[in-house]
């Protein structure tokens, strides 16, 4: 309602062929001037911006690829370092075990040698003690036999004489090694 009355009153909405012509001429002149003076610089700015964006994208891709490569290299280096550390620990454990076994074998050997040496010494002392006791027994038997032969006696006198002779001998005691020692 209101719109048709406004449109009817206005001269701007009326189609006027002269106005259309001059509007088209002005538009074409403006388009030619813009194309001639402004279109080139605008297009070059747009192209330059496109190149800059493409360059930034390529640079970002390269940097990302480089970062991924560095990350992979670091992961590989860390894995290698862990592997080397594990190998070193394994080697050290083996060497420590070998050293412990060698030390135990050496200790056993030394203990066995000490044991054998002590046993030899004990056997020597025992042999000396037995030889000494035998020598004393022979001497005693010879003395008793000599006295018995020199004096003919009855059994009670012989026993008394043997006891008297034995009492005159120095006392003997046996040590822990089995050796006989004379004491006063």
Swiss-Prot record:
The Gene Ontology CC terms held by the record are:
plasma membrane; proton-transporting ATP synthase complex
Subcellular localization is given as: Cell inner membrane
- Entry keyword Ion transport: yes
Q: Which key words tag this protein in UniProt? A: ATP synthesis, Cell inner membrane, Cell membrane, CF(0), Hydrogen ion transport, Ion transport, Membrane, Transmembrane, Transmembrane helix, Transport
What are the GO MF terms of this UniProt record? proton-transporting ATP synthase activity, rotational mechanism; proton-transporting ATPase activity, rotational mechanism
Its principal location? membrane
Q: Does the keyword Transcription regulation apply?
A: no
- Note the topology in the membrane: Single-pass membrane protein
Listed as disulfide-bonded, the cysteine pairs are: none
Instruction: List the InterPro entries hit by this protein, alphabetically.
Output: ATP_synth_b/b'su_bac/chlpt, ATP_synth_F0_bsu_bac, ATP_synthase_B_chain
Q: Which domain of life, per UniProt?
A: Bacteria
Transmembrane ranges, per UniProt, are 15-34
Recorded family membership: Belongs to the ATPase B chain family.
Described function? F(1)F(0) ATP synthase produces ATP from ADP in the presence of a proton or sodium gradient. F-type ATPases consist of two structural domains, F(1) containing the extramembraneous catalytic core and F(0) containing the membrane proton channel, linked together by a central stalk and a peripheral stalk. During catalysis, ATP synthesis in the catalytic domain of F(1) is coupled via a rotary mechanism of the central stalk subunits to proton translocation. Component of the F(0) channel, it forms part of the peripheral stalk, linking F(1) to F(0).
The record's listing under PANTHER family reads: ATP SYNTHASE SUBUNIT B, ATP SYNTHASE SUBUNIT B', CHLOROPLASTIC
* Subunit architecture: F-type ATPases have 2 components, F(1) - the catalytic core - and F(0) - the membrane proton channel. F(1) has five subunits: alpha(3), beta(3), gamma(1), delta(1), epsilon(1). F(0) has three main subunits: a(1), b(2) and c(10-14). The alpha and beta chains form an alternating ring which encloses part of the gamma chain. F(1) is attached to F(0) by a central stalk formed by the gamma and epsilon chains, while a peripheral stalk is formed by the delta and b chains.
The identity of this protein, by name, is: ATP synthase subunit b
> What are the top taxonomic ranks of the organism?
Bacteria, Pseudomonadati, Myxococcota, Myxococcia, Myxococcales
- Name of the encoding gene: atpF
């Amino acid at each position: 309602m209101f719109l048709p009355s406004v449109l009817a009153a206005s001269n701007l909405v009326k189609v006027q062929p002269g106005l259309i012509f001059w509007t088209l001429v002005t538009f074409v002149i403006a388009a030619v001037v813009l194309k001639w003076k402004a279109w080139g610089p605008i297009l070059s700015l747009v192209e330059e911006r496109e190149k800059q964006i493409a360059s930034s994208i390529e640079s970002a891709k390269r940097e990302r690829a480089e970062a991924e490569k560095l990350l992979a290299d670091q992961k590989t280096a860390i894995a290698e370092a862990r592997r080397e550390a594990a190998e070193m620990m394994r080697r050290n454990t083996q060497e420590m075990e070998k050293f412990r076994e060698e030390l135990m074998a050496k200790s056993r050997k030394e203990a066995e040698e000490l044991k054998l040496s002590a046993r030899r010494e004990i056997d020597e002392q025992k042999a000396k003690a037995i030889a000494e006791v035998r020598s004393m027994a022979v001497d005693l038997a010879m003395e008793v036999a000599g006295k018995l032969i020199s004096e003919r006696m009855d059994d009670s006198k012989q026993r008394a004489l043997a006891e008297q002779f034995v009492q005159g001998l120095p006392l003997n005691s046996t040590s822990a090694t089995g050796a006989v020692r004379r004491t006063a």
